[in-house]
């Protein structure tokens, strides 16, 4: 922080105010916190998301699962969100015609039998 303040004062010739120095300090703290959070592994976060309570073994969430589910690529929810139930209309049409064909065969068997 002092390095930024001295660089600013040398460049402009003016000593920075306490507001600016506090602003620099806040930015530096936020950057360091962000770096620490980036180092954590998402899989480790996912494991620590649900823990057992000591008294009666009830589960409670620590709040990290929101970030972990986003960063794990093999999430079970991803294929259902990305792909529709039937990929193309032709496949949907073929499946529905197959479905109705089997019903018609069943009706024919029932009526003839």
From Swiss-Prot:
Protein's name in the database: Uncharacterized mitochondrial protein AtMg01220
This protein's GO CC annotations: mitochondrion
Domain of life, source organism: Eukaryota
UniProt keyword list: Mitochondrion
Organism field: Arabidopsis thaliana
Record localization: Mitochondrion
Predominant subcellular localization, coarse grouping: mitochondrion
């Amino acid at each position: 922080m002092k390095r930024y303040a001295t660089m600013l004062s040398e460049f402009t010739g003016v000593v920075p105010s306490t507001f600016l120095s506090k602003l620099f300090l806040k930015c530096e703290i936020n950057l360091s916190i962000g770096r620490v959070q980036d180092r954590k592994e998402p899989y480790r976060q996912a494991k620590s998301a649900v823990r057992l309570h000591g008294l009666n073994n009830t589960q409670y969430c620590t709040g990290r699962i929101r970030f972990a589910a986003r960063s794990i690529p093999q999430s079970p929810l991803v294929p259902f969100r990305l792909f529709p139930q039937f990929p193309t209309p032709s496949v949907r049409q073929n499946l529905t015609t197959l479905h109705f064909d089997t019903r018609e065969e069943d009706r024919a068997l029932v009526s003839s039998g």
